[in-house]
Amino acid sequence: VTKVVQSMPGLSPSVGGFRNDIIIRGGAPNETVYYLDEIEIPNINHFSTQGSAGGPQGMINISFIDEVTLSTSAFGVEYDNPLSGVLQFNQRNGNTKYISGNFRFGASDSAITIEGPFSKSDNNKTTFIFSARKSYLQFLFKLIGLPIRPDYWDFQGKINHKIDEYNSLNIIG
């Protein structure tokens, strides 16, 4: 997601291009504040270095993303005190009709996502979406003889219960 955002006017990637830093109008990479469903998160990437906000691998599962909003000025009061910008990620709810899922196999990791209604007895008011992701960079690095062994597991989940037409309860983790 950050690679797409980096292509917008006034934004640039980090020098070297291997990190997911977002530099807004010349500000430092750690001056951008990230929110996931209106909860501030300090870092959205694995393997970040001091003074940066981006490592080479994102932590947020793209299967969960419903909407991304970037604000580069005139921040609302709900965003505390960002210096360069605010990047807000909104997660989607699980499928209300049936259980489904996907499996992704990438260059550095593989992931599985499962979603659906909890039960038909509550008229599909409660949905879930869960995923797990595992890197296999450590095996690739070992094969080519590199001394480092980067390794990570990601688990992400969201449960949504629709209380009425205007209210819902979300549990994320």
Predicted regions and their residues:
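Periplasmic N-terminal accessory/gating domains of Gram-negative outer-membrane beta-barrel systems
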Residues: V1-G76, V86-N93
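Outer-membrane beta-barrel architecture
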Residues: K3, I23, V86-Q88, N102, ...
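Transmembrane beta-barrel architecture of outer-membrane proteins
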Residues: Q6, R19, G55, I65, ...
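Short sequence motifs at beta-strands and strand-loop junctions characteristic
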Residues: S14-G16, I62, Y79, R104-G106, ...
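Outer-envelope beta-barrel architecture signal
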Residues: N30-T32, F64, K97-G101, D122-F128, ...
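Extracellular loop and loop/strand-boundary signature of outer-membrane beta-barrel proteins
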Residues: A53, Y98-S100, L140-P147
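Flexible, solvent-exposed coil segments and beta strand-coil junctions
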Residues: D66-E67, G85-K97, R133-L140, P150
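Transmembrane beta-barrel wall of Gram-negative outer-membrane proteins
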Residues: G106-Y136, G145-G173
